[in-house]
Amino acid sequence: MRSLSIFGATGSIGESTFDLVMRKGGPEAFRTVALTGGRNIRRLAEMARALKAELAVTAHEDCLPALREALAGTGTEVAGGAQAIAEAADRPADWTMSAIVGAAGLVPGMRALKHGRTLALANKESLVTAGQLLMRTAQENGATILPVDSEHSAVFQALAGEDTACVERVIITASGGPFRDWSLERIRACTVAEAQAHPNWSMGQRISIDSASMFNKALELIETREFFGFEPDRIEAVVHPQSIVHAMVGFCDGGLMAHLGPADMRHAIGFALNWPGRGEVPVARIDLAQIASLTFQKPDEERFPALRLARDVMAARGLSGAAFNAAKEIALDHFIAGRIGFLDMAAVVEETLAGVSTDPLFGKVPDALEEVLAMDHLARRAAEEAAGLRQQKR
Protein backbone atom coordinates (compact mmCIF):
# COMPACT_ATOMS: atom_id res chain seq x y z
CA MET A 1 0.00 0.00 0.00
CA ARG A 2 1.32 3.43 -0.95
CA SER A 3 2.07 5.75 1.97
CA LEU A 4 1.66 9.53 2.04
CA SER A 5 1.86 12.62 4.22
CA ILE A 6 0.11 15.96 3.74
CA PHE A 7 1.77 19.06 5.20
CA GLY A 8 -0.70 21.94 5.31
CA ALA A 9 -3.70 19.61 5.17
CA THR A 10 -6.30 22.16 6.26
CA GLY A 11 -5.36 24.82 3.69
CA SER A 12 -6.88 25.07 0.21
CA ILE A 13 -4.24 22.82 -1.43
CA GLY A 14 -4.42 20.37 1.45
CA GLU A 15 -8.21 20.20 1.22
CA SER A 16 -8.03 19.47 -2.51
CA THR A 17 -5.39 16.80 -1.89
CA PHE A 18 -7.54 15.23 0.81
CA ASP A 19 -10.52 15.23 -1.58
CA LEU A 20 -8.57 13.40 -4.28
CA VAL A 21 -7.08 10.88 -1.84
CA MET A 22 -10.55 10.07 -0.49
CA ARG A 23 -11.94 9.69 -4.01
CA LYS A 24 -9.14 7.23 -4.80
CA GLY A 25 -10.07 5.04 -1.85
CA GLY A 26 -8.84 6.89 1.23
CA PRO A 27 -7.51 4.54 3.93
CA GLU A 28 -8.24 1.50 1.75
CA ALA A 29 -5.79 2.75 -0.89
CA PHE A 30 -3.26 4.79 1.11
CA ARG A 31 -1.49 4.57 4.44
CA THR A 32 -1.49 8.11 5.80
CA VAL A 33 1.67 8.69 7.80
CA ALA A 34 1.18 12.31 8.87
CA LEU A 35 -1.23 15.23 8.51
CA THR A 36 -0.34 18.73 9.67
CA GLY A 37 -2.44 21.86 10.03
CA GLY A 38 -2.80 25.15 11.84
CA ARG A 39 -5.56 26.28 14.18
CA ASN A 40 -8.45 24.53 12.43
CA ILE A 41 -8.28 21.63 14.87
CA ARG A 42 -11.77 20.39 14.14
CA ARG A 43 -11.02 19.93 10.44
CA LEU A 44 -7.58 18.43 11.06
CA ALA A 45 -9.15 15.86 13.39
CA GLU A 46 -11.88 15.05 10.83
CA MET A 47 -9.24 14.41 8.18
CA ALA A 48 -7.13 12.30 10.52
CA ARG A 49 -10.15 10.17 11.39
CA ALA A 50 -11.20 9.76 7.76
CA LEU A 51 -7.72 8.73 6.61
CA LYS A 52 -6.82 6.84 9.80
CA ALA A 53 -3.66 8.92 10.02
CA GLU A 54 -0.81 7.65 12.16
CA LEU A 55 0.13 11.20 13.25
CA ALA A 56 -1.65 14.57 13.34
CA VAL A 57 0.32 17.73 14.10
CA THR A 58 -0.82 21.28 14.75
CA ALA A 59 1.66 24.07 14.13
CA HIS A 60 0.50 25.78 17.33
CA GLU A 61 1.43 24.17 20.64
CA ASP A 62 -1.44 25.93 22.43
CA CYS A 63 -3.86 23.98 20.18
CA LEU A 64 -2.39 20.60 21.14
CA PRO A 65 -4.81 19.89 24.04
CA ALA A 66 -7.80 20.43 21.72
CA LEU A 67 -6.27 18.14 19.08
CA ARG A 68 -5.51 15.48 21.67
CA GLU A 69 -9.13 15.59 22.88
CA ALA A 70 -10.54 15.51 19.33
CA LEU A 71 -8.56 12.38 18.46
CA ALA A 72 -8.82 10.56 21.78
CA GLY A 73 -9.38 6.85 21.31
CA THR A 74 -8.54 6.83 17.60
CA GLY A 75 -4.99 5.54 17.83
CA THR A 76 -3.69 8.62 16.02
CA GLU A 77 -0.62 10.11 17.65
CA VAL A 78 -0.74 13.89 18.15
CA ALA A 79 1.93 16.59 18.45
CA GLY A 80 2.27 20.36 18.26
CA GLY A 81 4.74 23.07 17.25
CA ALA A 82 7.20 23.78 14.47
CA GLN A 83 9.69 21.16 15.66
CA ALA A 84 6.97 18.51 15.67
CA ILE A 85 6.12 19.36 12.05
CA ALA A 86 9.79 19.07 11.08
CA GLU A 87 10.06 15.70 12.83
CA ALA A 88 6.91 14.48 11.07
CA ALA A 89 8.77 14.93 7.76
CA ASP A 90 11.36 12.40 8.98
CA ARG A 91 8.75 9.64 9.04
CA PRO A 92 9.02 7.47 5.90
CA ALA A 93 6.32 8.12 3.28
CA ASP A 94 6.33 7.34 -0.43
CA TRP A 95 4.68 10.65 -1.40
CA THR A 96 4.63 13.92 0.52
CA MET A 97 2.50 16.97 -0.24
CA SER A 98 4.23 20.21 0.81
CA ALA A 99 1.39 22.73 1.06
CA ILE A 100 2.32 24.79 4.11
CA VAL A 101 2.07 28.43 3.08
CA GLY A 102 5.13 30.67 3.37
CA ALA A 103 8.71 30.09 4.46
CA ALA A 104 7.47 27.76 7.23
CA GLY A 105 7.11 25.05 4.59
CA LEU A 106 10.82 25.02 3.75
CA VAL A 107 12.08 22.93 6.68
CA PRO A 108 9.69 19.95 6.38
CA GLY A 109 10.16 19.94 2.59
CA MET A 110 13.93 19.76 2.95
CA ARG A 111 13.67 17.01 5.57
CA ALA A 112 11.45 14.94 3.26
CA LEU A 113 13.92 15.30 0.38
CA LYS A 114 16.80 14.12 2.55
CA HIS A 115 14.95 10.83 2.92
CA GLY A 116 14.69 10.40 -0.86
CA ARG A 117 10.93 10.95 -1.06
CA THR A 118 8.70 12.08 -3.90
CA LEU A 119 7.79 15.63 -2.89
CA ALA A 120 4.72 17.25 -4.44
CA LEU A 121 5.71 20.88 -4.02
CA ALA A 122 2.90 23.41 -3.68
CA ASN A 123 4.96 25.60 -1.37
CA LYS A 124 6.45 28.01 -3.90
CA GLU A 125 8.48 29.79 -1.24
CA SER A 126 10.75 26.75 -0.92
CA LEU A 127 12.05 27.14 -4.47
CA VAL A 128 12.15 30.92 -4.25
CA THR A 129 14.09 31.06 -1.00
CA ALA A 130 16.36 28.04 -1.40
CA GLY A 131 15.95 26.76 -4.95
CA GLN A 132 19.57 25.81 -5.58
CA LEU A 133 19.87 24.08 -2.20
CA LEU A 134 16.53 22.31 -2.64
CA MET A 135 17.34 20.95 -6.10
CA ARG A 136 20.81 19.85 -5.00
CA THR A 137 19.35 18.06 -1.95
CA ALA A 138 16.88 16.20 -4.17
CA GLN A 139 19.63 15.15 -6.58
CA GLU A 140 22.01 14.02 -3.84
CA ASN A 141 19.35 11.87 -2.17
CA GLY A 142 17.62 10.44 -5.22
CA ALA A 143 14.42 12.30 -4.41
CA THR A 144 11.88 13.57 -6.92
CA ILE A 145 10.21 16.98 -6.84
CA LEU A 146 6.90 17.34 -8.66
CA PRO A 147 5.64 20.91 -9.11
CA VAL A 148 2.06 21.49 -8.00
CA ASP A 149 1.66 25.10 -9.09
CA SER A 150 -0.62 24.87 -12.13
CA GLU A 151 1.90 26.80 -14.25
CA HIS A 152 4.92 24.70 -13.34
CA SER A 153 2.97 21.46 -13.60
CA ALA A 154 2.04 22.61 -17.11
CA VAL A 155 5.69 23.32 -18.02
CA PHE A 156 6.74 19.97 -16.51
CA GLN A 157 4.19 18.16 -18.68
CA ALA A 158 5.06 20.15 -21.82
CA LEU A 159 8.74 19.23 -21.39
CA ALA A 160 8.10 15.49 -20.99
CA GLY A 161 10.39 13.63 -23.38
CA GLU A 162 11.85 16.85 -24.80
CA ASP A 163 15.47 17.94 -25.13
CA THR A 164 15.68 21.05 -22.95
CA ALA A 165 18.57 22.31 -25.10
CA CYS A 166 15.96 22.93 -27.80
CA VAL A 167 13.81 25.12 -25.55
CA GLU A 168 13.88 28.78 -26.60
CA ARG A 169 11.41 30.18 -24.09
CA VAL A 170 9.02 29.31 -21.31
CA ILE A 171 5.87 31.37 -20.92
CA ILE A 172 3.75 31.21 -17.78
CA THR A 173 0.35 32.83 -17.72
CA ALA A 174 -1.31 35.14 -15.21
CA SER A 175 -5.01 35.87 -14.93
CA GLY A 176 -4.16 39.48 -14.15
CA GLY A 177 -6.21 39.25 -10.96
CA PRO A 178 -9.03 41.62 -10.05
CA PHE A 179 -7.00 44.70 -11.03
CA ARG A 180 -5.94 43.76 -14.55
CA ASP A 181 -8.10 46.55 -16.06
CA TRP A 182 -7.76 49.08 -13.23
CA SER A 183 -5.85 52.34 -13.57
CA LEU A 184 -2.73 52.94 -11.50
CA GLU A 185 -4.57 55.53 -9.39
CA ARG A 186 -7.43 53.15 -8.65
CA ILE A 187 -5.04 50.33 -7.73
CA ARG A 188 -3.17 52.65 -5.38
CA ALA A 189 -6.40 53.29 -3.42
CA CYS A 190 -7.71 49.70 -3.35
CA THR A 191 -8.91 47.97 -0.18
CA VAL A 192 -7.99 44.57 1.24
CA ALA A 193 -11.48 43.26 0.36
CA GLU A 194 -11.04 44.31 -3.27
CA ALA A 195 -7.55 42.79 -3.46
CA GLN A 196 -8.63 39.39 -2.19
CA ALA A 197 -11.55 38.99 -4.64
CA HIS A 198 -9.99 36.82 -7.36
CA PRO A 199 -12.06 36.54 -10.57
CA ASN A 200 -11.10 32.98 -11.57
CA TRP A 201 -9.57 30.94 -8.74
CA SER A 202 -10.87 30.01 -5.30
CA MET A 203 -7.94 30.63 -2.95
CA GLY A 204 -7.08 31.86 0.53
CA GLN A 205 -6.72 35.54 1.43
CA ARG A 206 -2.95 35.83 1.23
CA ILE A 207 -2.48 34.08 -2.10
CA SER A 208 -5.45 35.99 -3.57
CA ILE A 209 -3.81 39.30 -2.64
CA ASP A 210 -0.49 38.03 -4.00
CA SER A 211 -2.31 37.35 -7.26
CA ALA A 212 -3.81 40.85 -7.31
CA SER A 213 -0.37 42.41 -6.86
CA MET A 214 1.19 39.83 -9.20
CA PHE A 215 3.69 38.97 -6.46
CA ASN A 216 2.36 35.46 -6.95
CA LYS A 217 3.48 35.56 -10.58
CA ALA A 218 6.79 37.12 -9.55
CA LEU A 219 7.41 34.15 -7.26
CA GLU A 220 6.49 31.80 -10.10
CA LEU A 221 8.98 33.42 -12.47
CA ILE A 222 11.71 32.82 -9.88
CA GLU A 223 10.44 29.25 -9.35
CA THR A 224 10.67 28.57 -13.08
CA ARG A 225 14.27 29.73 -13.05
CA GLU A 226 15.17 27.55 -10.08
CA PHE A 227 13.22 24.39 -10.92
CA PHE A 228 13.89 24.10 -14.65
CA GLY A 229 17.23 25.93 -14.77
CA PHE A 230 16.47 28.16 -17.76
CA GLU A 231 18.17 31.53 -18.03
CA PRO A 232 16.03 34.56 -17.08
CA ASP A 233 15.88 35.90 -20.65
CA ARG A 234 14.10 32.70 -21.71
CA ILE A 235 11.35 33.02 -19.11
CA GLU A 236 8.39 35.36 -19.43
CA ALA A 237 4.86 35.95 -18.17
CA VAL A 238 1.77 36.98 -20.12
CA VAL A 239 -1.67 38.02 -18.90
CA HIS A 240 -4.32 35.51 -19.95
CA PRO A 241 -7.69 36.45 -18.38
CA GLN A 242 -9.42 33.15 -19.14
CA SER A 243 -6.95 31.06 -17.05
CA ILE A 244 -7.26 28.16 -19.51
CA VAL A 245 -3.70 28.06 -20.86
CA HIS A 246 -1.42 27.62 -17.86
CA ALA A 247 1.95 27.67 -19.60
CA MET A 248 3.61 27.41 -23.01
CA VAL A 249 7.01 26.14 -24.08
CA GLY A 250 8.61 27.42 -27.28
CA PHE A 251 11.10 25.22 -29.14
CA CYS A 252 13.94 25.86 -31.58
CA ASP A 253 11.84 24.65 -34.53
CA GLY A 254 9.29 27.42 -33.95
CA GLY A 255 6.73 25.16 -32.29
CA LEU A 256 4.88 26.38 -29.20
CA MET A 257 3.56 23.69 -26.87
CA ALA A 258 0.64 24.92 -24.75
CA HIS A 259 -0.90 23.17 -21.76
CA LEU A 260 -4.62 23.81 -21.28
CA GLY A 261 -6.55 22.86 -18.17
CA PRO A 262 -9.42 23.95 -15.92
CA ALA A 263 -8.94 26.62 -13.26
CA ASP A 264 -8.99 23.96 -10.56
CA MET A 265 -5.95 23.08 -8.46
CA ARG A 266 -7.07 19.45 -8.30
CA HIS A 267 -5.83 19.14 -11.89
CA ALA A 268 -2.17 19.78 -10.95
CA ILE A 269 -2.50 17.95 -7.63
CA GLY A 270 -4.02 14.94 -9.37
CA PHE A 271 -1.18 14.84 -11.89
CA ALA A 272 1.37 14.80 -9.05
CA LEU A 273 -0.58 12.17 -7.10
CA ASN A 274 -0.89 9.85 -10.12
CA TRP A 275 2.62 10.44 -11.54
CA PRO A 276 4.40 8.79 -13.34
CA GLY A 277 1.12 7.61 -14.84
CA ARG A 278 -2.17 9.42 -15.23
CA GLY A 279 -5.42 8.78 -13.41
CA GLU A 280 -8.93 10.15 -13.52
CA VAL A 281 -9.34 13.52 -11.81
CA PRO A 282 -12.85 14.90 -11.12
CA VAL A 283 -12.46 18.33 -12.73
CA ALA A 284 -14.50 20.08 -15.41
CA ARG A 285 -13.55 19.26 -18.98
CA ILE A 286 -12.70 22.14 -21.31
CA ASP A 287 -15.16 22.92 -24.11
CA LEU A 288 -13.16 24.99 -26.59
CA ALA A 289 -16.23 25.82 -28.68
CA GLN A 290 -17.91 27.30 -25.63
CA ILE A 291 -14.82 29.31 -24.68
CA ALA A 292 -14.67 30.66 -28.25
CA SER A 293 -11.56 32.82 -27.74
CA LEU A 294 -8.37 32.96 -25.71
CA THR A 295 -6.60 36.29 -25.24
CA PHE A 296 -3.09 37.23 -24.15
CA GLN A 297 -1.37 40.54 -23.38
CA LYS A 298 1.87 41.81 -21.92
CA PRO A 299 1.70 42.69 -18.21
CA ASP A 300 2.07 46.35 -17.23
CA GLU A 301 5.09 46.48 -14.91
CA GLU A 302 4.27 50.03 -13.81
CA ARG A 303 1.02 48.83 -12.27
CA PHE A 304 2.56 45.51 -11.22
CA PRO A 305 6.20 46.25 -10.23
CA ALA A 306 6.61 42.85 -8.56
CA LEU A 307 7.48 41.40 -11.99
CA ARG A 308 10.36 43.83 -12.45
CA LEU A 309 11.68 43.00 -8.97
CA ALA A 310 11.49 39.28 -9.77
CA ARG A 311 13.77 39.79 -12.76
CA ASP A 312 16.35 41.43 -10.51
CA VAL A 313 16.20 38.41 -8.20
CA MET A 314 16.45 35.94 -11.10
CA ALA A 315 19.63 37.69 -12.23
CA ALA A 316 21.18 37.91 -8.74
CA ARG A 317 20.25 34.36 -7.58
CA GLY A 318 22.05 33.24 -4.42
CA LEU A 319 19.89 34.13 -1.42
CA SER A 320 18.24 37.13 -3.05
CA GLY A 321 15.08 35.03 -3.39
CA ALA A 322 14.99 34.45 0.36
CA ALA A 323 15.20 38.21 0.92
CA PHE A 324 12.51 38.84 -1.71
CA ASN A 325 10.09 36.35 -0.19
CA ALA A 326 10.65 37.50 3.40
CA ALA A 327 10.09 41.13 2.46
CA LYS A 328 6.97 40.21 0.48
CA GLU A 329 5.48 38.35 3.45
CA ILE A 330 6.13 41.25 5.83
CA ALA A 331 4.73 43.78 3.35
CA LEU A 332 1.62 41.65 2.91
CA ASP A 333 1.12 41.46 6.68
CA HIS A 334 1.21 45.25 6.89
CA PHE A 335 -1.19 45.70 3.96
CA ILE A 336 -3.73 43.25 5.43
CA ALA A 337 -3.49 45.09 8.76
CA GLY A 338 -4.23 48.38 6.99
CA ARG A 339 -0.90 49.96 7.88
CA ILE A 340 0.39 50.46 4.31
CA GLY A 341 -1.20 50.83 0.89
CA PHE A 342 -1.38 48.26 -1.89
CA LEU A 343 1.47 49.67 -3.99
CA ASP A 344 3.54 50.21 -0.85
CA MET A 345 4.09 46.45 -0.76
CA ALA A 346 6.36 46.55 -3.82
CA ALA A 347 8.15 49.60 -2.44
CA VAL A 348 8.85 47.78 0.84
CA VAL A 349 10.26 44.80 -1.06
CA GLU A 350 12.44 46.98 -3.29
CA GLU A 351 13.80 48.95 -0.33
CA THR A 352 14.49 45.73 1.57
CA LEU A 353 16.41 44.20 -1.34
CA ALA A 354 18.50 47.35 -1.65
CA GLY A 355 19.17 47.35 2.08
CA VAL A 356 20.35 43.74 2.40
CA SER A 357 22.13 43.46 -0.97
CA THR A 358 25.47 44.40 0.61
CA ASP A 359 25.32 41.46 3.03
CA PRO A 360 27.73 38.64 2.02
CA LEU A 361 24.88 36.12 2.10
CA PHE A 362 22.78 37.96 -0.49
CA GLY A 363 24.48 36.60 -3.62
CA LYS A 364 25.79 33.38 -2.04
CA VAL A 365 24.65 29.94 -3.14
CA PRO A 366 23.52 28.43 0.18
CA ASP A 367 25.37 25.43 1.55
CA ALA A 368 22.92 24.83 4.39
CA LEU A 369 19.41 25.66 5.50
CA GLU A 370 20.80 27.83 8.29
CA GLU A 371 22.08 30.35 5.73
CA VAL A 372 18.64 30.57 4.13
CA LEU A 373 17.03 31.17 7.51
CA ALA A 374 19.66 33.79 8.38
CA MET A 375 18.88 35.78 5.22
CA ASP A 376 15.17 35.35 5.87
CA HIS A 377 15.59 36.80 9.37
CA LEU A 378 17.76 39.68 8.15
CA ALA A 379 15.31 40.62 5.39
CA ARG A 380 12.29 40.44 7.70
CA ARG A 381 13.89 42.94 10.07
CA ALA A 382 14.74 45.25 7.17
CA ALA A 383 11.22 44.92 5.76
CA GLU A 384 9.65 45.75 9.13
CA GLU A 385 11.70 48.95 9.20
CA ALA A 386 10.78 49.84 5.62
CA ALA A 387 7.08 49.17 6.26
CA GLY A 388 7.20 51.24 9.44
CA LEU A 389 8.59 54.21 7.53
CA ARG A 390 5.91 53.81 4.86
CA GLN A 391 3.24 53.77 7.55
CA GLN A 392 4.55 57.03 9.03
CA LYS A 393 4.29 58.72 5.62
CA ARG A 394 0.61 57.81 5.12
Curated annotation (Swiss-Prot):
Pfam families: DXP_redisom_C (PF08436), DXP_reductoisom (PF02670), DXPR_C (PF13288)
Positions annotated to bind Mn(2+): 149, 151, 220
Keywords: Isoprene biosynthesis, Manganese, Metal-binding, NADP, Oxidoreductase
Binding-site positions, 1-deoxy-D-xylulose 5-phosphate: 124, 150-151, 175, 198, 211, 216-217, 220
GO molecular-function terms, A-Z: 1-deoxy-D-xylulose-5-phosphate reductoisomerase activity; manganese ion binding; NADPH binding
Residue ranges of coiled coil: none
Binding-site list for NADPH: 10-13, 38-40, 123, 125, 204
GO biological process entries: isopentenyl diphosphate biosynthetic process, methylerythritol 4-phosphate pathway involved in terpenoid biosynthetic process
Disulfide bond residue pairs: none
SUPFAM superfamilies: 1-deoxy-D-xylulose-5-phosphate reductoisomerase, C-terminal domain (SSF69055), Glyceraldehyde-3-phosphate dehydrogenase-like, C-terminal domain (SSF55347), NAD(P)-binding Rossmann-fold domains (SSF51735)
Keyword check for NADP: yes
Membrane-spanning intervals of the chain: none
Pathway: Isoprenoid biosynthesis; isopentenyl diphosphate biosynthesis via DXP pathway; isopentenyl diphosphate from 1-deoxy-D-xylulose 5-phosphate: step 1/6
Cofactor(s) of this protein: Mg(2+); Mn(2+)
Enzyme Commission identifier(s): 1.1.1.267
Entries under InterPro entries matching the protein: DXP_reductoisomerase (IPR003821), DXP_reductoisomerase_C (IPR013644), DXP_reductoisomerase_N (IPR013512), DXPR_C (IPR026877), DXPR_C_sf (IPR036169), NAD(P)-bd_dom_sf (IPR036291)
Family: Belongs to the DXR family.
Record's function text: Catalyzes the NADPH-dependent rearrangement and reduction of 1-deoxy-D-xylulose-5-phosphate (DXP) to 2-C-methyl-D-erythritol 4-phosphate (MEP).
UniProt-recorded name of the protein: 1-deoxy-D-xylulose 5-phosphate reductoisomerase
Organism: Cereibacter sphaeroides (strain KD131 / KCTC 12085)
Classification of source organism: Bacteria, Pseudomonadati, Pseudomonadota, Alphaproteobacteria, Rhodobacterales
